[in-house]
Amino acid sequence: MDTAYVVGTFDTKGAELGYVAGLVAARGVPVVTVDVSTSGPETGTADARPADVGNVEVAGHHPDGAAAVFTGDRGTAVTAMAVALERFLAGRAVGGVIALGGSGGTALCTPAMRALPVGVPKVMVSTVASGDVSSYVDATDIAMFPSVTDVAGLNRISRRVLGNAAHALAGAMTGDIASTEDKPAVALTMFGVTTPCVTEVASRLEARYDPLVFHATGTGGRAMEKLVDDGLIGAVLDLTTTEVCDLVAGGVMSAGEGRLDAIARTGVPYVGSCGALDMVNFGAFETVPERYRDRNLYVHNPQVTLMRTTPDECREIGSFIAAKLNACRGPVRFLLPEGGVSLLDAPGQPFHDPDADGVLFEVLESELRQDGDRRIVRVPHNINDPAFADAVLTAFEEVLGAGTIQEGQRE
């Protein structure tokens, strides 16, 4: 059976870590305890056994050696130990990992968790788990457990919370999950306003492929690209590239400057489109920046306000996408839905703007370096028309012919 790694600072949380390790081991899971204390090489509390792997051994995995960790400055020490822990775990067959900590321990342990493949069970019991945890979790599957009380001693509350977390890890490591490894995994990106298109395409792929749909909310795009980098995605149908709008105009659902980089790095077969490139996302209406208050705004729901992209923004969006796709070494098709890029971009709908769409399409056509494997395809339909789904599947078969899904690129 795979090994569970129980990680934390044994100089301050030895009893709690030992308690968790014992519960996981009681479920029949092999356990290795790992000390990441940064206070110095002498660690461990009187009421807890020493860790199986000491903090000096872990610190030695830092590129500059253990001295880079034990600096005497807590801030730099935590950052350096995080690097060391990531490198330490990377060299081991990790079946699952659980860590305990406050803000410092959470910042120390979660980078190593994020570096592990999606699907490896990861549990972080943290004092900061009840707030915004996006900086700790990012686009991965870390399960954050609020500690409720501080991680500072065993009591009736902490025993229950830590016990639940320990059993969650053990259950994840020992439970059976039906495998779909016989089908290559294909990623699709979707938004509410491109749902008809993506649902139709996904349903027609299911017989031969394992379609994985990602919500294009920033985190969704990053998650998809992480799986591409991990070799778990065999082809990408990136029909909803809307996260680029938020990057360009300062919306709340940007996937960052690295959007599309994994596609270029890996050469994965790629079919893309302009799904929801007509909109920038903000929160509730009152959160829309003052400079945008006179723009074409649409209240999607009480928590989401959409802003129509202008021709100038569309020009910048098109240039960004073209530059990224020019770097791709794999087969690329990028489809332009001339009838509109979303449900809101259709005749009579609030974001229908053929001029803005026209600028977007012209920039993509002029700046994308087209050749046999990298092509723009105009489609005279709205992105949600059934005929557009037909065009997507035709392009998909074309890119698969140019770049077959490899055996290693499966779920």
Curated annotation (Swiss-Prot):
Domain of life of the native organism: Bacteria
Range of residues in the leader sequence: none
Family, similarity comment: Belongs to the UPF0261 family.
NCBIfam families the UniProt entry points to: PRK02399.1-1, PRK02399.1-2
Protein known as: UPF0261 protein SACE_5696
Protein species of origin: Saccharopolyspora erythraea (strain ATCC 11635 / DSM 40517 / JCM 4748 / NBRC 13426 / NCIMB 8594 / NRRL 2338)
